[in-house]
Amino acid sequence: MGTPNPADGAAPRRGRASGWARRALAACGLALVLVLAYLFGCEPRYRGTLVVRPPRPLVFAHRGFGDHAPDNSLYAVERALTAGLDGVDVDGQLTRDSELVIFHDLSVDRLTADTGHVRDKTAAQMLALDLGPKYDPRLRGANVHTFEDFVRDVKGRGILMVELKVPGLAASGIERRAVEIIQRYAAHDYVVLSSFNPVVLYRVKRLDPKVRTALIFMDTNWNPELIAEIKPGDVVNLPWPLRQEFIRRAIRKIVRPDLLSINHQVDEAVLDRLIAKGWPVFIWTPDEENALRRALAKRPYGVISDQPIRAQQLRDQ
């Protein structure tokens, strides 16, 4: 009788183990392929339930009617709503003491007599700033206001679309503050929170799925508006991934925004495909006559323009 060899049967066991490992690896690979195919594959039809398509494209004033009154001011919003516009697009930022104020630029230099960044100022300091004199030396009292002031003032007379501006991916509290105010005033029907940052919109939906969100995007890595209006040190390039349509497609599937806000210079084929798939699309800042006509001809959900009165006239022709 021979001495048992410890190696006897080890090779078959190793073979069985390696076979399981190969099958497990293949299954993981297949799962990864399926996930990537879902995320980066064809655009699904829009299935949102919080947005009702209007009978004609909506017309929003960019920067709160900023070409006709002080930028992002309540004074401008009142003028826009009085003119019969469907809504306004404004910008929200957090102050140093975590108040959400409506202000376009990252710094206050261009629009006020003060200097410095919004994030470095308290709410009291921001609300003391007058937007009037830089727009018109004769205009006084068009002060900066909070998001809460805007929500309370609009009261459903139009739609208030607020771009939440954040410095990065880290949680800043801006989403929670915005959602708290929407809930306090039961403003779900007339407030939309928008952002270039999909993480911001994801957080908003985690806080309250009934708050309507809009994902903003463009194809270029620079914003002509920012270049023209804001100090060069404030201009932040749009990250490469957010300029790639295959990545944006995956973002739309994960974040599930209720609307899209698309720059009018985005690849026309992308814009046409999204509209054909049923996405409620805002086209932002077509300002020249021809650009407005092209945008409205696509029958989008709406346009956001610095020339909203002309856009309104063209739409109603």
Regions found by a protein language model. Name each.
Residues 2-317:
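Phosphate-group recognition and catalysis centered on beta-loop-alpha active-site segments
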